[in-house]
Regions:
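Eukaryote-biased, non-catalytic alpha-solenoid scaffold regions
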Residues: 1-401
Length: 401
């Protein structure tokens, strides 16, 4: 059967095109007269048709006006401001395609608006801030294109980072892969990386991260950070990736308490038994042991962590490192340990999620009276046990938790 033609009253591009250019022009002018932001967008589109110089001039007018404004923006007017900024951003992106260096300069001016806007815009939901963070990749894409066309442009961008390091630290972090290692290195060459200006250390650290400059990144770590187990773990992982195993050990040991000289407990085994440091530190120390060829010790720490936390990822890593067939026996041992774990709620959650429903049902039968706190997933667990272990499911539903 032949398809019916589109209804002429339906609002779509094809039907609007049928109205003709003159009619559409009149309609757009009527809409623009009632919507200043639409009017500015149309002006930018027309300017782009005239060329890069005309578009740059039109952008400069509006960017200057927004920067000069001191009026407060209420929550009612905030959506219009976001629209206006978005239209400007689209215009800057168009200019970047036509003239990369000119586009980058306007993109930096657009980002410079952020500081003033934070002082006069009520933005409890962070819509304005989100707009700038979302545009961060466009900044670095424009910068990369401009610097490739004219390397001298990197000087202006580096000066912007130097002048406003806190803001640019934010845009560097939000830029992701759009900030290329080559561009990051060019900026670092032009920055005072030892500057004590507030925010500069963060900006330089993030640039060093993007530039794969591990030594510079490490040099920016404070004594407090080096003493933090989680940060020490980050340092160690980066050093291990670079093949610097000895330094990775030093990084981890730098976070030890009470003393790194107590080598017997280097990897977190306190004399009274429990592991003392953070999961990230422990995971990094396992990677270090593997890199040093201390496979048995790495496995020993994995097992100790599992015994303590009933962590499924840790157990999977432990089993994956065992020879063939040994993993079956080890899994039986792990499930038996889980069934006797001191925290019955943690034990039941682990067995249900693994999944090991037979062991979970047996645990319910033996230890359900030990439940002292609510079990948010009780109904779901009972439903999963009901078919094969109906008595355990009933007891679970009847439990006080």
């Amino acid at each position: 059967m032949a398809r019916r033609p589109a209804a002429p009253k339906r609002l779509n591009a094809a039907n609007l095109t049928g109205l003709g250019a003159d009619r559409l022009g009149d309609l757009l002018m009527q809409a623009a007269d009632a919507d200043p932001i639409l009017k500015r967008r149309l002006r930018l589109i027309l300017a782009a048709e005239a060329g890069a110089d005309a578009l740059a001039l039109e952008l400069d007018k509006r960017l200057t006006a927004v920067a000069a404004s001191r009026s407060r923006v209420s929550w009612r007017k905030r959506p219009d401001l976001v629209r206006d900024l978005s239209v400007l951003s689209e215009g800057v992106e168009t200019l970047s395609r036509l003239a990369p260096a000119e586009g980058l300069m306007r993109r930096m001016v657009w980002f410079d608006l952020f500081r003033g806007l934070t002082l006069r815009v009520k933005d409890p939901r962070g819509e304005v801030a989100d707009l700038f963070e979302t545009a961060a990749p466009a900044l670095w894409q424009a910068a990369d294109a401009a610097v490739r066309a004219d390397p001298a442009v990197a000087e202006a961008l580096a000066q912007a980072v130097q002048d406003h390091p806190m803001d640019y630290a934010r845009w560097i972090g939000a830029g992701g892969e759009a900030l290329t290692p080559d561009l990051a290195r060019r900026l670092l060459e032009r920055l005072d990386t030892a500057s004590g200006v507030r925010g500069m250390r963060t900006a330089v650290r993030r640039l060093a991260d993007r530039a794969d400059d591990l030594d510079l990144w490490l040099s920016l770590a404070t004594p407090e950070e080096r003493g933090s187990p989680d940060f020490a773990a980050v340092m160690a992982r980066r050093l291990l990736i670079a093949g610097r195993v000895v330094e990775a050990r030093q990084a981890l040991e730098g976070a030890l308490s009470p003393s790194p000289a107590n080598r017997r407990w280097t990897f977190g085994r306190a004399p009274d038994g429990p592991l003392r440091l953070t999961p990230a530190w422990e995971a990094a120390s396992i990677d270090l042991m593997e890199a040093e060829g201390r496979k048995d010790e790495a496995q020993g720490l994995r097992w100790a962590m599992f015994e303590r936390d009933l962590s499924a990822p840790v157990l999977r890593a432990y089993l994956a490192s065992l020879p063939d067939f040994d993993d079956v026996e080890a899994l039986d041992r792990a499930l038996a340990h889980a069934a006797t774990h001191a925290d019955v709620e943690t034990a039941l959650g682990f067995l249900m999620d693994w999944p090991a429903h037979r062991e979970a049902a047996a645990l319910v039968e033996r230890r359900i009276r030990e439940v002292r706190s609510p079990l948010p997933l009780k109904a779901d667990w009972a439903a999963r046990l009901a078919q094969k272990y109906p008595e355990a499911a009933e007891r679970l539903l009847a439990s006080p938790g």
